[in-house]
Amino acid sequence: MYRIIAVDLDGTLLTSENKITKYTKEIIQILIQKKFYFVFASGRHYIDIMKIKDSLKINIFIISSNGSKIYNLDNNLIFSDNLDENIASKLCRIKYSDKEIITQVYQNDQWYINNNKVENNFCSLLSSLQYKYFYPDDLNFKNISKIFFTSRNFQKLHILKRKIINFYGNKVHVNFSIPGCLEIVSGDHLKGYGLKLIANLLGVSLKNCIAFGDGMNDQDMLKVAGKAYIMKNSDPHLKIALPHLEIIESNDNDGVARCLNKIFIENNKEML
């Protein structure tokens, strides 16, 4: 019997306008009342996810920065895995002067960027956090949970991905959350590890976990869950990597909520 529902946010639970629809909110509320545990698993900063959680007025587990930080139902940090300081220092410098690529950093409760080119459209629209500018020589590289590079020049990002993988190997995990956003976290602990930790904490088998995602940064979580679905709007590479998974409706068509309703609520329509 499924007890844990793990859901990615951008491209999965959230619409393209970064909103949660009324229908999705209703389904989540019903399942919370039915004693299901929700896990919001995202590349976003913890503060961003907390604001989404608070808007729903529910208690959930949080996996933030692609697994670097994990929080329990009481909003307490129960796991943390930051990037190696030397690696973080080099990554912050590698494309700092490239005007086509924005270097972005999550450190503790802060969000730093090297420049804000409006045409990249990957900054303030995706976050409720306020970013600050950073200079590599002035930044302390401790407690950096994630570094990510955003650009409209996808070819440059793919070249950068190969360069980072070739240089650092399994010391880091490098993947795209969306085509124009290349994310780097510690190589040891990802969303899948976070789901394992939470399931173990609750005494729930991974077989009783259900997961939803749309990006390559969701792949390991989708693999470890007992049941997993990918979105119609998913990254084509994810569909190729996990061809056995069922594809559900898109994030703009309440794909997650419709699937959950079909599985858990459809026989009790009077509840809706």
UniProtKB/Swiss-Prot annotation:
Keyword terms, alphabetized: Hydrolase, Magnesium, Metal-binding
Source species, domain of life: Bacteria
GO MF, one annotated term: magnesium ion binding
Binding site residues for phosphate: L9, S42, G43, K191, N217
Sequence positions that bind Mg(2+): D8, D10, D214
Pfam families: Hydrolase_3
Cofactor(s) in the UniProt record: Mg(2+)
Catalytic residues (UniProt): D8 (nucleophile)
SUPFAM superfamilies noted in UniProt: HAD-like
EC number(s) from the headed UniProt entry: 3.1.3.-
Similarity field: Belongs to the HAD-like hydrolase superfamily. Cof family.
NCBIfam families attached to this UniProt entry: Cof-subfamily, HAD-SF-IIB
Name of protein: Putative phosphatase BU028/BU029
Species lineage: Bacteria, Pseudomonadati, Pseudomonadota, Gammaproteobacteria, Enterobacterales
